[in-house]
Design a protein with these regions (language model features):
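Extended alpha-helical solenoid/arm regions of large eukaryotic scaffolding proteins
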Residues: 1-96
Length: 96
């Protein structure tokens, strides 16, 4: 299982390995889901909410995204596809 920090900054996969944006991880890994969303890092914030499995965090990300994008999406919107975030079981991490 990936750590929270590796999961939220995963930019893709190469076979059984997650490819992680090391620069973004170093800069933003300590931020909460709310702080990531407030900074406009919606993909990372969404990933963090998915990783935590906390519905309140997911609602917070959606509300912050809607305010920034002037949209009115709810949980039924396919945010997984929008942000390209899908939980995947991998054990290896490659940091770029």
């Amino acid at each position: 299982m990936l750590s929270r920090e590796d999961f939220i900054f995963t930019i893709g996969y190469d076979g059984p390995a997650a490819i992680v944006d090391g620069q973004a991880k170093r800069k933003f890994a300590s931020l909460s889901t709310k702080e990531l969303a407030e900074k406009g890092l919606f993909r990372a914030a969404y990933s963090s909410a998915i990783y935590s499995k906390d519905p309140a965090e997911l609602d917070l990300v959606i509300a912050t995204y809607n305010a920034a994008a002037h949209t009115n999406y709810d949980r039924s919107f396919p945010f997984d596809r929008l942000f390209g975030v899908f939980p995947v079981e991998v054990n290896k991490v490659v940091v770029l």
